[in-house]
Regions:
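Regulatory and interdomain segments flanking nucleotide-handling catalytic cores
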Residues: 1-262
Length: 262
């Protein structure tokens, strides 16, 4: 077999499955913890500040490492990363838009960052944290906003169920709790939570109820010589507004209107 012929044939196999995104469209990457119910079983339930710390550090690393990343949003063990490659005519997509490479790289960055932060902060996990990742494009920035609205609505429903589930487990068996919560709406679960435990759902932290985000924003920097300057810095926002009621908040970040033009 001729070496060149073999190389070309194998290369053709690879090219067939090297799917790429259409250029100049926003890329959404959804990164999920694999088997995190077991991995995080030693952490406080229903809400853990330690876990939030790990997820926030992971978002920071993703925003810093992924070309074109402008916004990251997390709730539970899921991170939604928004990347753009249409800011200028010359802007190129990360990894030339290769779906496989974008997904594999983001899952690797998330896994190593989460583990590194856990080790540095002495946070106990069961086994090694592993993230999976999938990516897709949406037609415009308005659909990016709608994607994030949908994610935050899912976060609300998840946090309501999680709060109700784990607080009721302090009084009842697993089977009883499962049967009690079955087919209840989020509003009914909130009422049940208060009736059974006296806990107001809104007393939980905003980051548990609405999720947390990471993005670049202008910050005033103080220098040792007494001077000051404004720079764009990656920031964590753990007190988010309700996206559906504050669309401008998301739009300004996604479109870069909140960024200082240096």
């Amino acid at each position: 077999v001729k070496v060149n012929t073999l190389r070309e044939r194998i290369s053709e196999y690879e090219k067939i499955y090297d799917y790429r995104f259409i250029r100049k469209l926003p890329i959404i990457t959804v990164i999920n913890g694999r088997s995190f119910k077991k991995t995080t079983s030693l952490l406080k339930k229903p809400f853990s500040e330690d876990f939030l710390k790990l997820m926030c550090y992971t978002m920071i690393r993703l925003l810093a490492e992924v070309d074109g990343a402008v916004f990251a949003y997390c709730y539970s063990d899921e991170i939604t990363l928004v990347s753009r490659n249409d800011q200028t005519h010359e802007t190129e997509p990360w990894y030339n838009g290769s779906i496989q490479k974008i997904s594999s790289a983001t899952s690797s960055i998330a896994s190593t960052s989460f583990l590194m932060s856990a080790l540095e902060n002495d946070i106990n996990l069961i086994g090694d944290p592993i993230f999976t990742s999938s990516s897709f494009v949406v037609p415009n920035t308005m659909e990016v906003v709608n994607t994030l609205i949908n994610k935050q609505q899912s976060a609300f429903n998840y946090s309501v169920h999680s709060a109700c589930y784990f607080e009721l487990l302090k009084k009842y068996t697993y089977d009883t709790v499962d049967d009690t919560l079955k087919n209840l709406t989020s509003e009914e679960k909130i009422d049940l939570l208060f009736q059974e435990t006296g806990i107001e759902f809104n007393s939980y932290s905003s980051s548990f109820r609405k999720g947390a985000a990471c993005y670049r924003a202008p910050k005033l920097i103080d220098h040792q010589d007494g001077s000051q300057e404004i720079k764009n810095k990656i920031t964590i926002d753990a007190d988010l507004p309700t996206f559906s009621k504050n669309i401008d908040f998301l739009s300004e970040i996604i479109t870069g209107k909140n960024i200082l033009k240096l």
